[in-house]
């Protein structure tokens, strides 16, 4: 049971981290400062995987 909770915790942290990274990326590629482009959930997952591979 503890293992299941550990996996769920890791999944939630990874999902939250991908959201934060995607927002930072959206700000970086925005046309104007403070105007972030919308990024979908699959783009967030892709960015998370790319970030994990690069680090």
Curated annotation (Swiss-Prot):
GO (cellular component) term, any one: extracellular region
Subcellular location: Secreted
Keywords from the named record: Neurotoxin, Secreted, Signal, Toxin
Taxonomic superkingdom: Eukaryota
GO molecular function: toxin activity
Residues excised as propeptide: 23-29
Keyword Secreted: yes
Entry comment describing in which tissues the protein is expressed: Expressed by the venom gland.
Principal place of residence: secreted
Signal peptide location: 1-22
Function: Probable neurotoxin.
UniProt record similarity statement: Belongs to the formicidae venom clade 4 family.
Name of the protein described by the UniProt record: Myrmicitoxin(1)-Pr6b
């Amino acid at each position: 049971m503890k293992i299941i909770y550990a996996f769920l915790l890791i999944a939630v942290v990874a999902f939250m981290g991908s959201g934060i990274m995607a927002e930072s990326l959206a700000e970086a590629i925005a046309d104007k400062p403070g105007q972030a482009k919308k990024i979908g959930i699959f783009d967030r997952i892709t960015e998370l995987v790319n970030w994990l591979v690069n680090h």
